Amino acid sequence: MFNWVKTAMLMAAITALFIVIGGMIGGSRGMTIALLIALGMNFFSYWFSDKMVLRMYNAQEVDETTAPQFYRMVRELATRANLPMPRVYLIDESQPNAFATGRNPEHAAVAATTGILRVLSEREMRGVMAHELAHVKHRDILISTISATMAGAISALANFAMFFGGRDENGRPANPIAGIAVALLAPIAGALIQMAISRAREFEADRGGAQISGDPQALASALDKIHRYASGIPFQTAEEHPATAQMMIMNPLSGGGLQNLFSTHPATEERIARLMEMARTGRFD
C-alpha cells in the first residue's frame, strides 16, 4: 500500500512540475495549455504506446505453433496469476532482456529477446515471465508510460522556456536567469521522479513475480545471469530509444556515469538480496 501511495505522490509531482513550467512560459494560460497537452499526450500513450514500442523493437508475435514451450509457459503463469492470456512476442536481439506492455491486463503483451531464451534455464525463464506478468497485474505499464511521457515533455518544455523565454502573470517577460535555471533543473527533477517511480515498481514486480511463480530464487538467479551477460552485449534499439529502457527487466543501456546515476532500475544486488530473503523466509510482504 505504501508503494502505491508513494507512486501516486510522485505522479502528482511530475504532473505539477510540467504545469509549473507551462506557467513560467505563458502565465496562467500557459499552465492551462500545459495541462491540456499533458492530458492529450497521456491519452495517446494510453491507447497506442504498446503498438509503438512493439513496432520499434520489430517484435514478432508467436503462438503455440511457432514457440510452443515459451507460449505454454506464459499461459501457465497467466493462469496462476488469474490474468487473461497476453499476446506473446519475440525480439531478435542477442542481449538477454524482456518487458511487458499494454494499457491494461485485457490488452497486455509480453516480449522477450531471443538472447534471454538462449541464456536462461526454463526455471529462470519462468521467474522472468512471472515478473513481467506482475507488471501487468499491477498495471505498471500505464504508470511507466505516463511517467516517461511526462518526463520527456518536461524536458521539451524546459528547452522551449530557455530559448524563447517566459511570461509572468501580467504578460511581462519573466526573469531570464530564473528561466534558464528552471530549464536546466526541471529535466533533472523530472528524471529523478521518473526514476523513483520506476524503481519502486520494479521491486513490486519482483515481489509479485515471486508470488506468481512461487520460486523467488529462480528470479534471483535469472537477474544475476542477465546482469552479467547484458553488460557486455549492446542493445541497439534500446540505445536509440533510451526512454523505453525503464520497461525492461534489466537496464539495457551500456552507458556509464550520469546514465547509471539516473538509472530507472534498482541495483541488481539489492533486488537479488530481497528475493533471496523471500526464498529464505517464505514471506512475500
From Swiss-Prot:
InterPro entries: HtpX_protease (IPR050083), Pept_M48_protease_HtpX (IPR022919), Peptidase_M48 (IPR001915). One of its GO terms (cellular component) is plasma membrane. GO terms for biological process: proteolysis. It is found in: Cell inner membrane. It comes from the Bacteria. It is a multi-pass membrane protein. Zn(2+) binds at residues 131, 135, 202. Keywords: Cell inner membrane, Cell membrane, Hydrolase, Membrane, Metal-binding, Metalloprotease, Protease, Transmembrane, Transmembrane helix, Zinc. Pfam families: Peptidase_M48. Binds 1 zinc ion per subunit. It is an enzyme of class 3 (hydrolase). Its EC number is 3.4.24.-. One of its GO terms (molecular function) is metalloendopeptidase activity. The active site is at residue 132. Its cofactor is Zn(2+). PANTHER family: PROTEASE HTPX (PTHR43221:SF1). This is Protease HtpX homolog. The lineage of its organism: Bacteria, Pseudomonadati, Pseudomonadota, Betaproteobacteria, Burkholderiales.
